[in-house]
Amino acid sequence: MRSLIEVQRKLLPELLSVMQKRYQILQYIRLMQPIGRRNLAVSLGLTERVLRSEVTFLKEQDLIDIYPSGMTLTNEGELLLAELEEVMKEVSGLRLLETTLKEAFSLSEVVVVSGDSDQSPWVKNEMGRASVSCIKERLVGKKNTVAVTGGTTLAAVAEMMTPDLKHPDVLFVPARGGLGENVQNQANTICAKMAEKSMSHYRLLHVPDQLSDEAYRSIIGEPSIKDMLHLIKSAGMVVHGIGDAMTMAERRKTPQADLEKVKNGHAVGEAFGYYFNHQGEVVHKVKTVGIQLDDLKNNKCVIAVAGGSSKAKAIKAFMQQAHDSILITDEGAAKELVRDFN
């Protein structure tokens, strides 16, 4: 396939350019359908005149339908888009990025979606769609309990969840307590939404994300909390985000003394309440109720979802000690990561 693509790149470069543009249009319609032409043009940075001619072509090929409410993909469009994905990964260099990152971090799999979620918010939805696909593929045997963390990226994963899981007994649980942030970005809310959209089940953990030593000892001694923590820690799959260290510290309203530890330790990334420096070393840990780093080593399928070029350092910090896990990211972050290796 690669040799054919290289031939086309040399002899018919405009063909690949047109194909990429039409692929992106179909991709965005799939994510946001039904969507109007004006919104689509603005989102993709195209003029309405250019988009009008492309939409006319796609309609003539029976790839999209146009309704008063907006454009949607036809069944033919859905099938073509799925078939095009592998080709477009070769054309755009995403496959090479995936291979490079997989080898650099010793991961079991890397999925890179096109675009940069820092620049185009819809890319986060595409990461969400890729994450849902990854979750479904790996829900086998005893791995029917899925623990999920909070954050805007995981909220996008929940948004893209669909009701076609092959295992109706899947149970979604929060990986940890709430952050006290925007309710739709809390782990409890996200796990409930994933369960509802996939027509499966969920259980919630009603405790704050971080506690004093005394409060922590008191809460984890409660029988109901103890049972819930056992269920969470025994989950066969964990889906989590990766945050920028200072952003997460500020969001948690971290005490000044702990904030100094984060700063002095040169932390750049955060996950599960652990703060990591450039070398992937833990420089600070928040006492949280839920999954700890050691829990990830117990034969779990661990899926990290994070993107945006601004998060490259945070992703690198965490993934250096997350061998054999799965990374789902975007082109913006992937290119920054690879650039950092060179």
UniProtKB/Swiss-Prot annotation:
Residues 37-56 bind DNA. It holds the Pfam family CggR_N. Keywords: DNA-binding, Repressor, Transcription, Transcription regulation. Gene3D superfamilies: 3.40.50.1360, Winged helix-like DNA-binding domain superfamily/Winged helix DNA-binding domain. InterPro entries: CggR_N (IPR048715), NagB/RpiA_transferase-like (IPR037171), SorC_transcr_regulators (IPR051054), Sugar-bd_dom_put (IPR007324), WH-like_DNA-bd_sf (IPR036388), WH_DNA-bd_sf (IPR036390). One of its GO terms (molecular function) is DNA binding. SUPFAM superfamilies: NagB/RpiA/CoA transferase-like (SSF100950), Winged helix' DNA-binding domain (SSF46785). It comes from the Bacteria. Homotetramer. Belongs to the SorC transcriptional regulatory family. In the absence of glucose, represses the transcription of the gapA operon, which encodes five key glycolytic enzymes. This is Central glycolytic genes regulator. It comes from Priestia megaterium (strain DSM 319 / IMG 1521). The gene is cggR.
